Amino acid sequence: MSGWSHRHVLDLASFSRDDYATVLELAHRFRSMPVTGARKLPALQGRLVATLFFEPSTRTRSSFELAAKRLSADVQSFSPSSSSLSKGESLLDTARTYVAMGADVLVIRHRCTDVPAQLASELDQAGERTVVLNGGDGQHSHPSQGLLDLYTLAHHFDPRNSQLDALQGKRIVIVGDVVHSRVARSNLWALSACGADVVLCGPPSLVPDAFAAFLDAPPPGQASDPVRERGTVQISRSLDDCLSGADAVMTLRLQKERMTDHLLTNLDRYHRDFGLTHERLRRCAFSGPVLHPGPVNRGVEMSGGLLDDRSICLVEDQVRNGIPIRMALLYLMAASDPVAESSRASAPS
């Protein structure tokens, strides 16, 4: 297993291929726990993981907390509605409270971009040992979702190894509300790093032409791209054209709560033009997997029948794979010597 150099995990733009490989390899081993009969590992015993979610979440929060518990970490949950934030306490002071309690990892979700990065910078300047894991910030990034989507696809194409090479040269379609999606941005960094070619599909209001140049410059805040050669990004306005010849398709939730400019007014028309159904997949001779990061608007992004078809739709696999991926991240960030310990008996083999 290669080295791990990330103190905080704030985005995937800073990940190298070795970083992706390290996470996927470890997650694949953790995924075998139910098969081998092991339900809990002592790897993070005595560590404290605090989940600070300033936005509603079911899957991500529960997945992180279950991942931490499977590594024997203590978990402290934060709820804004019952916190001192309602009394005027700042977000930073709230986070410092958990640091003072001895939190080793802060998993943070916030509606504003860069809040996790700002907090990580504050902690570094103060010399604190606590690390920050971005659970989703604004429209910027959702690293663990991008990684679990990557792993789900790698496992689908190569169940035995589930490694990066399984995605080399694959054509992956991402359809829907790209402009508001931190998931889409994380997937663009992850999939392109593995050599996949990504096609973004949707109306101009949701998939602006500017996304065609998403990978053209070095990642924000970096002098160079940590990935030497990436796959490509293209834009299409026709879902039928995209699906013909595609290896997989991911559809994104319409984030109506972020649509302040009435970007979409007719959901029936959207479903007709960009919704996934069995009939559309047959018409386009598409036989690959269908993904969705959730939650799903049935009858909008995809039909209820397709969502429930486990032979095609990998939504439940994504949820299931989120646990070992988040276990891997927590393990790499909080274990005293994660690279060395990952080969010991405390991790599954």
Curated annotation (Swiss-Prot):
One of its GO terms (biological process) is 'de novo' pyrimidine nucleobase biosynthetic process. L-aspartate binds at K87, R182, R253. Carbamoyl phosphate binds at R59, T60, R109, H142, Q145, G294, P295. Pathway: Pyrimidine metabolism; UMP biosynthesis via de novo pathway; (S)-dihydroorotate from bicarbonate: step 2/3. One of its GO terms (cellular component) is cytosol. Its EC number is 2.1.3.2. InterPro entries: Asp/Orn_carbamoyltranf_P-bd, Asp/Orn_carbamoylTrfase, Asp/Orn_carbamoylTrfase_sf, Asp_carbamoyltransf, Asp_carbamoyltransf_Asp/Orn-bd. Keywords: Pyrimidine biosynthesis, Transferase. One of its GO terms (molecular function) is amino acid binding. It catalyses: carbamoyl phosphate + L-aspartate = N-carbamoyl-L-aspartate + phosphate + H(+). Heterododecamer (2C3:3R2) of six catalytic PyrB chains organized as two trimers (C3), and six regulatory PyrI chains organized as three dimers (R2). Belongs to the aspartate/ornithine carbamoyltransferase superfamily. ATCase family. Catalyzes the condensation of carbamoyl phosphate and aspartate to form carbamoyl aspartate and inorganic phosphate, the committed step in the de novo pyrimidine nucleotide biosynthesis pathway. NCBIfam families: asp_carb_tr, PRK00856.1. This is Aspartate carbamoyltransferase catalytic subunit. It comes from Synechococcus sp. (strain CC9311). The lineage of its organism: Bacteria, Bacillati, Cyanobacteriota, Cyanophyceae, Synechococcales.
